[in-house]
Amino acid sequence: MNSVRQSCRPKHQVLILKCYPRFQKGVQSVKPNSSELSYLLYYASTRRSKLQKVGAFLEKRAARDVWRGKLGNVQVTLQILAALIEKVPRDLPLYARSILTVLDIVLRSREISMVEETIPTFELFCRHQDSATLTADHEYIIQYRELVGTYASFASTETPVTTKTPMSAPMALRWRTVGLKAIKSIVTSEILSTDGAKQLNVVIPVILQNLYASGDHRLSPLQEKAKSSERLEREQFRRRRMSISTVQTVDTIDGNGDPESASGSAADADMMAEMEARVLALRCLEKVFSGTNRVQIRFATSLVLSFIVSRRPPRTQEKQRSANGKTDGNWATNLLEVIANWSPVQDRFIILVTLLETLVERPLVDGQLEPQLTLASMMDWLLGSSVNLIGLSVMDVLIGLLQFVRQLLQLGNGTQTLVPHHGLSTLIKPLPQMDETAATNSQTNGENEKAPTADSLRHELLELLENCIGNLATHVYYGDQVSDMIRTIVIRIKPSPALEGENAHHESESDNAIQKSSPSRSDYTAESYFSSSAARITALRSVKDILVVANLRKSTSGTDPDARNRVPLHVWEGTHWLLQDPQWEVRNAYVDAFLSWLQLETKKSDLRVPTEHTRVSKMGNRRDTSDIPERLARRIVSTAPQEENVAACHASSFLQLLHLTIFDVVSESSTTESDILRLYLLLVNLVEHLGVNAARYTLPVLMKLQDTLPSSVSASKALHIGSLVHGYLLALVEKFDLEGTRPAAEIINEISKRKKRGVWLDKIQLPPRPLHHIQPSLDTVIEQASLPQPDKNIYSRFTSLEELVRQIESTYNSSYVSPPISPSNSPGRSFSIPSLGLNNSTNPHVPAGSQLPLHVKEHMLAPWSKEACLDAIEKEKAKTSSLSGSRTATGAFAAGLNALNMSAYNSGPGSPTGTAPSASNRQDRPVSAAYAPTGNLAGFQKTRRQSIPERRVSPAASSRDSTVRVNELRRVLSVINSSNVRHPSPLRGRHRVDSTVSSTESMVSDNLSFSDAGTAAADRPLSSRENLTAPRGLNRYHGGPNQLHGDFEPEYIPPVPPLPSSLAIPGGFPADSRSGSSVTSPSHSPPRSDRPSTAPGRPARTHSKSKGSNASTLRQSRSLSRKKSLDTSLHERSERRATDLNGIPSGHSHGYSEDLGDIGIAITADTTEIAPHTQDRADTSSQWSRREASRTLSFGRRVDMDKLLEGLSAPNDDQQPNGTGEVSGIKIASSGVEGSSSLTRMGKKPSFQSMNDEKKASYSRKTSLLSPGAAPWNRLSSDRGGIGPPPY
């Protein structure tokens, strides 16, 4: 009967039924028959139409087995489905709904043994399912979500599973473990990215319920166990897959257990099982945040935050962290930090942004601020942690926090009091100490409070928001971030409407000078302002927190606090009016923030007076042939000094406005003792950290206040002013170490006299009293009747101001220490690099920044008045606008630089006039980068010849020139003198063209004599294209002409090889060389010797056009690539210079060195190939010219280009056969020219004569010296003048 029934069944049903084993009793784990299962899988994989029928039959079989309670058959059914998924995963959508139906049937049985068997099948299903199927089939989506909800309900701790039997603790733990394993498969599935919102909304709360423990907030042990369990899983995956027929023995099962739990009690085993469940929940949460889907991370973070807010974790640990510096935190903060570490580095900022959005979007209800407190404490912890939030928009987060602070301050109609109840000492927070000795008094009243009030909650939330703003400085990702943060807060501080009405007449007096708010305030709405006293206090305390955190903590980006740019002084622009705020708390908070800036953001370099940077002309950039990125970098770099000038102008305006406000505060009749002490503390700290930069403004103001002493209305006002003035003068004596001088004795005697007469404030002392000790409640009550009336006898004026300023100047000048010069890693703010020239003078050079500028000294001695101060501020404002946006100012700076350079030529120490530059130029003008020396190396005169070409460094050089180049260092170490320096060859290759020099490839030497420079400057106007700079050798001849003659000793000059009598220059000479009038000038040439005239150290030959005129010509550089027609000029010069000579004379033979002396060409090549003779040159000139093109020439002396150009422009008789007219070469007779200082002009083309026997012999002897190894001066091809392929 059974066989008949089987024969009527379809084949797929028969194959399925054969997989179930017959005998299942006594077997712990039932598995399908392996051979029958293999055939079933083959049958289903080869016939896709049978997959749906197989799934439908397994549904019926599972329903019947679950109803009958046959656990073994249920296990076989689930294993058949798992094997089918592994065999045909591509066709999973055909039978996916059948799998979900089978799983749902088993889960509804509420039998833990059956439900546990569904986990392996569900894991495979989640691993292989397709997300496209989920989006296409709506019924499938609903069925899958119901299955996810069922598994999540098993893992929930709040809604236990309803079973037929009572639930025990171990059984509940088993249900939770099953649910968590299924959730782990859900969060690792690809389908989560498609339907993540619905699934995460169900899964995340359940995970957090299992992870949350009210008594244990440590997550580090769980993380360690999670890593170990994950490692074990990886090892199991690496093992060979076991056969389904393999039976595990008891020893194998026991070996997988935990020996600790086996040896412990039942309670220990339950505790270990609970720990395993929490570890599993932690791994599930890690899978959610370790993905790269930002939408998923954002949504999951919002769910985590909602769960944490609902749990209301304690905030006591947060208070302890803010007081002690660090602590373990609570469960919520640790969880948030762990989640941030799990997330990808580039996506971690999403967590903080989501946290801020959750905080801002939650409605504010007075008295119900617990959720905001929890979120703010978590944000404070995350910002203060070491988690790198790269990609975070710090400014957006800052603006969002400021807006939330404004909303919080408006809560309760703005009538709430933000001062804490336990005293005023916490309003001014002292700077944290590194030795951790700060008192922790924030917990004194925490135990006594029964229930927090609305005011206390607002105040606590406000403190947390201030800490959040300050901790933003931990994450510094660009140089000016801290400055931008402070400026963003400062520009939102606005006076209250009442204060604006009181000071309306003051604003009319200084309409443009005194601005109580930044001009950029118009960009913001009125709601963004901090106009109340509480808002201003909060903003100023936030500024202080930013400064403290930025300096005491290392940035999470991996850089030290020194890596960022310092906060400049001009960020405080527009805040001086806060010294006149009606509320003393606001005045204290402002002084506290400003003192924090002075202590943390100033360095020793701020004690020096900043030098103004000048811009050089950009006209030379038109001929700049450097690449575009280099020019762009140079353009950006060159604007930095002008930005520094603008910042210096802003800082000067702020200091003047600050001192003007101090004058107004002291002059008011309502000024109290605490106000005087606060101003005294501010002034002393200003001079302590800014030096003369602050004293230049303070001294005139205090002298003006001193003049008002006899006319003071009340005796208390005279007491305040007198104590403030002389207390500050005593601080100057202490700062500049003036003890023992006459002004110091006068100041100390006056203070002693006033103390004896009882007209001195005892609280004016050095060091000044701390700010938290200056409070209105501690002011001393002064009786007017007990004070004598102010007169000239009691309050003696300080009259030694000039002597005091002179002593300050002396101390300033003597305290200068020249800093060592070292190459910087990147172009900083100082782009004007002094040239590495040598100073051979006996007097040491004093840098420009070492002396106190004259205008600073005059400013300290000048009388002060309100009108003059406002006029000076207006001038500074006009100068700032001109420097920042006007092209006229740029031209003026360039013209001024050219004028200074020309004055350096005409009035230098080595000039014929003998006049030195003025003292004002030496002190006030920055040292030019073209000739500023770096040291006195006058003792090294005997130097070797240098093989490195000289370069001029311009102030607007590119970023590559911002560091000291290796070539420049070698030039300094070799102590090169300009008299014997070989200059770069124009044919060697192109060097980088500088922005202020037209070409470094000029054929005219740049080592000009002083008389040449002076004459040229006087004879012709300065061209806009010729940006003259001082030559490198200018500051080397301070010793005068005698020293100059002493440098040209022949024994120190290396030998130079002789030249062939015939020379062929490929391509000819450029046609744009300057051919000005040639006149003679007194030359500082050394005595004649047997050395060739083409030697590099030899001065230029004197040219004689007329015997009666003596002058020199300053030849300008011309680029070799310029093209210019000379037909007209050559014709005019031919008619004007008629002579009786037809070519090069050959009357006197003065050797080879005289042959090319008139032309001025020096060949420094070690020639290995001899030029052909004259008779063979006609047919081999083309090949010989190409061979000669590989030779390296160096034009180290001036050249008479008229003579060469006329000869080259003449028609050539030796035309090539192809008719190209190529110049084959120039043959020059070996006979010299009579006299070494005369030059014969040619009126016609030169005649090239043939060589006789005597000349041929001389030629052969001379050319034999040019072969390699023939002379000891032969150099390698890598040296200058060596043989080698040209760089072009």
From Swiss-Prot:
Question: Which segments show compositional bias classed as Basic and acidic residues?
Answer: 1124-1139, 1174-1190
List the biased-composition ranges (Low complexity): 1073-1083
State a GO cellular component annotated for this protein.
Answer: plasma membrane
Region described as Disordered: spans on this chain: 500-522, 816-835, 906-964, 980-1155, 1167-1195, 1208-1288
Biased composition, Polar residues: where in the chain? 511-522, 906-921, 995-1012, 1212-1221
Which biological processes are named by the entry's GO terms? Answer: protein localization to plasma membrane
The entry's family comment says: Belongs to the EFR3 family.
Q: What is this protein called?
A: Protein EFR3
Q: Please give the organism.
A: Coccidioides immitis (strain RS)
Gene, per the UniProt record: EFR3
